Curated annotation (Swiss-Prot):
Biased composition (Basic residues): 65-83
Name recorded for this polypeptide: Oxidative stress-responsive serine-rich protein 1
InterPro entries: DUF776
GO BP terms: cellular response to hydrogen peroxide
Origin species: Homo sapiens (Human)
Keywords: Phosphoprotein
GO cellular component: nucleus
Amino acid sequence: MKSEAKDGEEESLQTAFKKLRVDASGSVASLSVGEGTGVRAPVRTATDDTKPKTTCASKDSWHGSTRKSSRGAVRTQRRRRSKSPVLHPPKFIHCSTIASSSSSQLKHKSQTDSPDGSSGLGISSPKEFSAGESSTSLDANHTGAVVEPLRTSVPRLPSESKKEDSSDATQVPQASLKASDLSDFQSVSKLNQGKPCTCIGKECQCKRWHDMEVYSFSGLQSVPPLAPERRSTLEDYSQSLHARTLSGSPRSCSEQARVFVDDVTIEDLSGYMEYYLYIPKKMSHMAEMMYT
C-alpha cells in the first residue's frame, strides 16, 4: 500500500511539472505574439493550482536525503561489446541409445527386474538430453513408453555395479556371450572367472587372444584402411611373435595380447582422446593480465 501511495505521489508530481512546462512554453509563445497581460493571469492560476502539490514532496526527499526513483532500475541487459564468443563447457551425453546389446542387458538385469520401475522414473531418455527438450511437454503415457525400453541402457553408479557383479557372475551362462559381446572387458573377464591360467610351464593355450584386436574402438570414424605393404609387415610381426612365444621361454598371456601398433592407430587414438576430452589451451599473456 505504501509503495502504491508513493507511486501515486510521484505521478502527480510529474504531471504537475509537465503542466508547468507546457503552460510556460505556451505563455512564451503567446507573449511573442503580443497578448502579454491577457495570458499571464491564467498561467499564474495554473502555477498556483500546482504549488500545493510541489510543497508536499514525496517522503523520499524528506530531510534532504534524496532517493533515486526506481523508474530506470529495470533495464534490459546491454549487448556484449566484445566480439569474442561465449565459451560454454562441453555437454557430455552419458547415455548411449545404441548400447542395447545383450551384454548391457546382462549388466542391467537387476534394474529391469525391479517391478515398480523406480529406476527409470527420474531419468529422461538420452534423446531428450541431446535435443535439450524438457520431458514436461510430453504427456505421462508417452514418457512411460520412452523410459521403459531405455531402462536397460541406463548407466549405473560403480557402487551399484560392485554389489551386483557377484550375483551377475553366477547368472551369466557362457553361451549367451557371443563374439560380438567381447567388446567390453567386463564380459571377457566374466568368461574366464574362476579358472586360473593354465599356461604356466607349457605353451600358451589361450586361443581367445589370437583373433582379438586390442585397439578397436567403436567411436573411431574415418580410419584409413592399411596399405597392403603395411598389412603384410603387421602379419609378419604377429607371426614372428607367435613363433617366439611357442619356441622360446614361456611367456604370459598378456604378452600375446600385445599387438603391433603402428603410427596410424596411434594418431587415430590421439584424435579420439581430443574428441572426448575437453583440454583448454594455455591462456595468452594479455588474457592472463586481464584475469589477474
